[in-house]
């Protein structure tokens, strides 16, 4: 792992999405400014994603916006990349100035970070969402409400910026229009460009095994791999009832071949005659694995159902993605802290 990737690992942005029966597509752009960066880390980075796929990159070393997906390079002319390169060079300078201003306000020195996330989502029913927010040192700083054309500020420093930004009603309306119209238009265009990759479906391969995790404690693991898209719902049932509170979940991780893998586990009560089954839902297919009490042979039943759960973690780095399931009742966005 290179120095850049190692440094960016704490800069994960967690995106928690509600339990959903439909597939969601998203377009997200992340910008990261670093003051006094360590060796090998650019002072400014910008990356774009469609769903979990990196599509564009820019950093202060190359100072060029470049495609990260072949279907982006094939469908967008050279003048597109040059035009947005010039815009991002402007953003690079703006981030440098704003980060220095924030450090003065907070009386901070040394290495600090300033982040921006903007994007939109397109749901299967045609409805859309949009989001724009900033973070300082990995903590929420300013969050845009496009419905009220206002900013949510988290502290006194943010309130000072909020007042200045809200004085420019033209800019607020521009951001709202970009989130609701232009962002969605770009997302639809990119989905068409990369439809062979972005809109394909590969079903999960699922298996269950037992493992003695502690002396006298047996844990059942349900593992799914080889699936795409990464939206998947896994649960354990005991005697036909879901046991969410007793389960543990693994990360949803890229397998390196364009598919994903994950797992869910539950501790087995050796003194009971409970019947356990693992249920996996992915793109309308429901996989049920019944765990025999004595035998290691596990029958597999598949049937068509509707329903899936969407959960995402996006790393604001250069092409490195990690995914993790979050509690299904939560929704919103959380920035994990970055090192000082």
Swiss-Prot record:
Region of interest: Alpha-3: 202-293
Positions of 5-(2-oxopropylideneamino)-6-(D-ribitylamino)uracil binding: 31, 46, 65, 116, 174-175
Residue numbers on the Extracellular membrane side: 23-302
Binding site for 8-(9H-purin-6-yl)-2-oxa-8-azabicyclo[3.3.1]nona-3,6-diene-4,6-dicarbaldehyde: 29, 31, 65, 80, 116
Highest taxon listed in the record's lineage: Eukaryota
Positions annotated to bind pyridoxal: 65
Chain residue ranges for the region called Antigen-binding cleft: 23-201
PROSITE patterns (UniProt xref): IG_LIKE, IG_MHC
SS bond list: 120-183, 222-278
Transmembrane segments: 303-323
Complex formation: Heterotrimer that consists of MR1, B2M and metabolite antigen. Major classes of metabolite ligands presented by MR1 include riboflavin-related antigens, pyrimidines and ribityl lumazines, nucleobase adducts and folate derivatives. Forms reversible covalent Schiff base complexes with microbial pyrimidine-based metabolite, which serves as a molecular switch triggering complete folding, stable association with B2M and translocation of the ternary complex from endoplasmic reticulum to the plasma membrane. Alternatively, forms non-Schiff base complexes with ribityl lumazines.
Protein's name in the database: Major histocompatibility complex class I-related protein 1
Annotated source species: Pongo abelii (Sumatran orangutan)
């Amino acid at each position: 792992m290179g120095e850049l990737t190692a440094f960016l690992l704490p800069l994960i942005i967690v995106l928690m999405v509600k339990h959903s029966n439909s597939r969601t597509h998203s377009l997200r752009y992340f910008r990261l400014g670093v003051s006094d960066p360590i060796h090998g880390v650019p002072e400014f980075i910008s990356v774009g994603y469609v769903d979990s796929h990196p599509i564009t990159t820019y950093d202060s070393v190359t100072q060029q916006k470049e495609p990260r997906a072949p279907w982006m390079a094939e469908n967008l002319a050279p003048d597109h990349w040059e035009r947005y390169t010039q815009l991002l060079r402007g953003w690079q300078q703006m981030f440098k100035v704003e980060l220095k201003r924030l450090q003065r306000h907070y009386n901070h020195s040394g290495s600090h970070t300033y982040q921006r996330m903007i994007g939109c989502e397109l749901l299967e029913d045609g409805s859309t969402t949009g989001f724009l927010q900033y973070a300082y040192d990995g903590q929420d700083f300013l969050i845009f409400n496009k419905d009220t054309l206002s900013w949510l500020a988290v502290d006194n420093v943010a309130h000072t910026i909020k007042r200045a930004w809200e004085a420019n009603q033209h800019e607020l309306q521009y951001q709202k229009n970009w989130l609701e119209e232009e962002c969605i238009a770009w997302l639809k265009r990119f989905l068409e460009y990369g439809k062979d990759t972005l809109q394909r479906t590969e079903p999960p391969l699922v298996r269950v095994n037992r493992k003695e995790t502690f002396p006298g404690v047996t844990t059942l693991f349900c593992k799914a791999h080889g699936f795409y898209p990464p939206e998947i719902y896994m649960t354990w049932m005991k005697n036909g009832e879901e046991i969410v509170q007793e389960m543990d979940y693994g990360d949803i991780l890229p397998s390196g071949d364009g598919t994903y893998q994950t797992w869910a586990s539950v501790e087995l009560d050796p003194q009971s005659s409970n019947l356990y089954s693992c249920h996996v839902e992915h793109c309308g297919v429901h996989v049920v694995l019944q765990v025999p009490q004595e035998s290691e042979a596990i029958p597999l039943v598949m049937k068509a159902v509707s329903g899936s759960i969407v959960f995402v973690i996006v790393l604001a780095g250069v092409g490195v993605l990690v995914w993790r399931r979050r509690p299904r009742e939560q929704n919103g966005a959380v920035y994990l802290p970055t090192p000082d």
